[in-house]
């Protein structure tokens, strides 16, 4: 099975922010770095044929053309005014669908429908609810995927964390899989750091683990500064950087180190 492309810029997915943030207090949003006047001046003009301009998906600074009715997802352009990016009715894994660009721009629920909801009814919405929208992902918690290449690792991280949160603390201490252990520690530390007043995390490292709990050979830092973070190559069994490899912005071509050893 081919290696899943590693993340270049991925903060924390919504379920992680909710679950880990709750452990240390109210979850704090992760914000993109501010756009400087210099960066905004470099933005190309929106095409004249664009009926509506909107903020970009991700931590970029340049406006894009909003999507009409049709396909959408976490890393696509935002839906036009009055539309909301939602998983299709009956989708068993709505968050998965949105990260794969398999949602749809639909008319947003009317205010009247929202007001007629029984206030006494229990709240049943969860991070995997069918009501999960692109707006909740990108606005409420500032969860930004800067390109379609980030999405496989996003879903990979969701799968890893879903298995983690079902375990007791004593089970976690018994883990032998190095990447899975490190990922849990990193997420726990990030959740605590986000509680500190005035702190703004614009770069950090989120381990890229495979389904067996070891490392993918390509690892990248998360960047919320509108450009890809650095990527490097590691040994899958230890996560240690491969001797002779260099950190680059983009694909470090990790396969070359393993091919040379054959």
Swiss-Prot record:
One GO BP: regulation of insulin-like growth factor receptor signaling pathway
Domain (IGFBP N-terminal) ranges: 28-108
Residue stretches spanning the membrane: none
Source superkingdom: Eukaryota
Any one annotated GO CC term: extracellular space
Region (Disordered): 101-133
Keyword Phosphoprotein: yes
An MF annotation (GO) of this entry: insulin-like growth factor II binding
Disulphide bond pairs: 32-59, 35-61, 43-62, 50-65, 72-85, 79-105, 179-209, 220-231, 233-254
Signal peptide: 1-25
Positions bearing Phosphotyrosine: 161
Ranges annotated as biased composition (Low complexity): 121-131
Entries under PROSITE patterns matching the protein: IGFBP_N_2 (PS51323), THYROGLOBULIN_1_1 (PS00484), THYROGLOBULIN_1_2 (PS51162)
Location of the protein in the cell: Secreted
Phosphoserine modification, residue list: 126, 129, 147, 245
All residue ranges annotated as the Thyroglobulin type-1 domain in the record: 176-254
Family matches, as SUPFAM superfamilies: Growth factor receptor domain, Thyroglobulin type-1 domain
Record text on subunit structure and interactions: Binds equally well IGF1 and IGF2. Interacts with integrin ITGA5:ITGB1. Interacts with VHL; this interaction inhibits HIF1A degradation.
Function: Multifunctional protein that plays a critical role in regulating the availability of IGFs such as IGF1 and IGF2 to their receptors and thereby regulates IGF-mediated cellular processes including cell migration, proliferation, differentiation or apoptosis in a cell-type specific manner. Also plays a positive role in cell migration by interacting with integrin ITGA5:ITGB1 through its RGD motif. Mechanistically, binding to integrins leads to activation of focal adhesion kinase/PTK2 and stimulation of the mitogen-activated protein kinase (MAPK) pathway.
Protein's name in the database: Insulin-like growth factor-binding protein 1
Organism: Sus scrofa (Pig)
Source organism phylogeny: Eukaryota, Metazoa, Chordata, Craniata, Vertebrata
């Amino acid at each position: 099975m081919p290696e899943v492309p590693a993340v270049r810029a991925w903060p924390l997915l919504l379920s992680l922010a909710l679950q880990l943030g709750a452990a240390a207090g109210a979850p704090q949003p992760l914000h993109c770095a501010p756009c400087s006047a210099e960066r905004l001046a470099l933005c190309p003009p929106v095409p004249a044929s664009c009926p509506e301009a909107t903020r970009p998906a991700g931590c970029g600074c340049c406006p894009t053309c909003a999507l009409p009715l049709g396909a959408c997802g976490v890393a696509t352009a935002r839906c036009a005014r009055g539309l909301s990016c939602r998983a299709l009715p009956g989708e068993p894994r709505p968050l998965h669908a949105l990260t794969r660009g398999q949602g749809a721009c639909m008319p947003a629920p009317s205010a009247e429908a929202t007001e007629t909801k029984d206030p006494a009814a229990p709240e049943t919405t969860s991070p995997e609810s069918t009501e999960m929208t692109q707006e909740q992902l990108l606005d409420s918690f500032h969860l930004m995927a800067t390109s379609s290449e980030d999405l496989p690792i996003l879903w990979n991280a969701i799968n890893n964390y879903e298995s983690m949160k079902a375990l007791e603390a004593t089970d976690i201490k018994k883990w032998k899989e190095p990447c899975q252990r490190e990922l849990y520690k990193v997420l726990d530390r990030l959740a605590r750091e986000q509680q500190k007043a005035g702190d703004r995390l614009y770069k950090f490292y989120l381990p890229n683990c495979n389904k067996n709990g070891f490392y993918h050979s390509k690892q990248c830092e998360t960047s919320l500064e509108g450009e890809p973070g650095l990527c490097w190559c590691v040994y899958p069994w230890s996560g240690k950087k491969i001797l002779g490899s260099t950190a680059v912005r983009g694909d470090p071509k990790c396969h070359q180190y393993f091919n040379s050893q054959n």
